[in-house]
A protein has these predicted regions:
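Conserved, mostly hydrophobic/aromatic
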Residues: 100
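A structural motif
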Residues: 60, 93-96
């Protein structure tokens, strides 16, 4: 809806950037599959190439796409990351910046172990991304302060943004 919308006589994305200095992103995932192996992959995204071309033409900067990890299952985490980075490559090829968002369930009893497996997997996949066309990461606040520093410093990462993922505002701010 927002992609085709307008404000003050301008297309929404251009208005957000030019008038409000808000960087426009487009949510492209179509929701989540049922949980399988402790994770929820993204549902298929029909018409992706056309959507990305339209977003680029309308002044969108990047995309957002979310998956969820609920258990420390290395095969499931790898499946989430494979899907996220495959989609990220398509977004990059369209001239947009993807926000890779593998959300970790904050109620997972093995959250810290999930984070360790997730970080390993992200670092491996980041090494396949050209630093000239970096990705962004949206990550659940980690159990250990500074845990994602290697990701923040990676040359193929434009920015890492925090995902509060169910924490109260006060708890998220404290983390």
């Amino acid at each position: 809806r927002t992609l085709d919308g307008s404000f003050a006589g301008k297309e929404a994305a251009r208005y957000l950037w030019e008038d409000k200095r808000v960087v426009p992103f487009l949510k492209i995932d179509k929701g989540l599959e049922a949980e399988d192996g402790g994770v929820q992959l993204m549902k298929p995204i029909p018409g992706l190439e056309e959507l990305l071309a339209k977003a680029k033409a309308k002044g969108v900067f990047g995309t957002k796409e979310r998956s969820v990890i609920k258990a420390n299952n290395p095969a499931g985490i790898a499946a989430v990351l494979d899907q996220q980075f495959e989609l990220a490559r398509k977004v990059l090829a369209a001239g947009l910046v993807p926000i890779v968002e593998p959300e970790v369930d904050i109620k997972a009893p093995d959250k810290a172990a999930i984070e360790a497996e997730l970080k390993r997997g992200i670092l491996q996949r980041l090494d396949t991304i050209d630093p000239a066309t970096p990705v962004m990461l949206k990550l659940t606040l980690p159990s250990v302060d500074g845990f994602f520093r290697e990701l923040v410093d990676h040359p193929a990462v434009l920015k890492v943004v925090a995902l509060s993922g169910g924490y109260s505002r006060d708890d998220a701010n404290a983390k």
